[in-house]
Design a protein with these regions (language model features):
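Pyridoxal 5′-phosphate
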Residues: 1-380
Length: 380
């Protein structure tokens, strides 16, 4: 069986989650917006229970969570939804990083075409944006800072909790794309972050569900305007019939992950140590700051090896990736590794390993390393 080391792209749905989803699809299948019968009442109550739990995982209030189809939609609502407020108040400056997911970069490029000024900060070889570099760019007209929690290609953790404290009390709003970090580093997201994007399928929930947390500042709501129209659901910020089975799947997945997080972290770190020990027999370089990375994502380049050729060679052994699944059809160098200042030869050949410990029992790092050694040309 091919070992799966691509959980940064998506995870297997936990069987307990699948059972919950099936229940809400086939038994309690009511519309949460139906108020005239018990099917709808049960669905609405269940959604509110899920909302309360998710809010608690990031230290938010129940009413501050809206359900979406995933982190891409959450990012778009957060970024494009802030634009009218920025225009009205002559605050058209936004700060972000050049290593963000395309679901952040592309909405911001769109805002540039509408007259917004966006600073895309580059992190350097560490892959980590310094808090000071963000603060140095702040201006009186800065509307928003948007920074990912964990980079999806390198696994490098960004200093979002520290930055949130620095931005507290300023008029600048702070958005965090937590698609890769939610559940793994729970304390970071309890910092005073105005908006948090969450993805379900990165923690064992089905694809097609996520959330956007929009915290109040005192009594004031985050000044978001809807980017879609057609109903009053989710505070009118995300109209449409609620996908109750998927929401309940996200709820169950978040509970399961929260309960198992300490063990998951220990086992993920143990797997990382096994990987690094085996790869030590090859000639390789870690891309990104290994001291500020999540334990389950590792991005490396092997000297003299083409990453695509290696993937083809080991396709019957292990499933790995060269970068983000959302851009894997593109043959351009990784925009993340390029923004870190790595040359095209490295940026073209970064290989990302990402794992959940429970899903890699069949993977032998030593066997993989032996394949790499056989493929690598002799050292000059």
């Amino acid at each position: 069986m091919v070992a799966y080391l691509d959980v940064a792209a998506t995870t297997r749905v936990d069987p307990r989650v699948a059972d919950v989803v099936l229940h809400w699809m086939t038994e309690d299948f009511g519309n949460a917006g139906s108020r005239t019968h018990e099917y709808g009442t049960r669905a609405k109550k269940a959604v509110q229970e899920a909302r309360t739990f998710l809010a608690g995982t990031v230290g938010a209030k129940t009413e501050e969570v809206i359900f979406t189809s995933g982190a891409t939609e959450s990012n778009n609502i957060a970024l494009l939804g802030m634009a009218p407020y920025g225009e009205k108040n002559q605050r058209r400056h936004i700060i972000t990083s050049a290593i963000e997911h395309k679901a952040v970069i592309e909405p911001l490029v769109h805002l540039q075409s509408k007259g917004f000024e966006v600073d895309f900060l580059e992190p350097g070889l560490s892959g980590r944006i310094a808090t000071e570099s963000v603060l140095e760019k702040l201006r009186p007209d800065t509307l928003l800072v948007s920074l990912m929690h964990v980079n999806n290609e390198t696994g490098v953790i960004q200093p979002v909790a520290e930055l949130a404290e620095e931005l507290r009390g300023t008029p600048t709003y702070f958005h965090v794309d937590a698609a890769q970090g939610y559940g793994k580093l729970p304390e970071d997201l309890k910092a005073p972050i105005d908006m948090i994007s969450i993805s379900g399928h990165k923690v064992g929930a089905p694809k097609g569900v996520g959330a956007l947390v929009t915290r109040r500042r005192g009594w004031d709501k985050t000044p978001l305007e809807p980017i879609m129209f057609g109903g009053g659901q989710e505070r009118k910020l995300r109209p449409g019939t609620l996908a109750v089975p998927l929401i309940m799947g996200l709820y169950e997945a978040a509970k399961v992950f929260q309960e198992g997080q300490p063990r998951w972290e220990r086992e993920a770190l143990a797997m990382r140590e096994r990987m690094l020990a085996a790869l030590g027999k090859t000639r390789f370089h870690i891309n990104g700051d290994a001291d500020h990375s999540v334990p389950h994502i590792l991005n490396v380049t092997f000297d003299g090896l083409n990453a695509e050729a290696l993937i083809v060679r080991v396709k019957d052994q292990v499933a790995v990736a060269t970068g983000s699944a959302c851009t894997s059809a593109s043959y351009t160098p990784s925009h993340v590794l390029t923004a870190m200042g790595l040359p095209d030869g490295v940026a073209n050949n970064g290989l990302r390993f990402s794992w959940f410990p429970s899903q890699v029992a069949d993977f032998d790092p030593e066997e993989f390393a032996a394949t790499v050694v056989r493929m690598q040309p002799d050292a000059p």
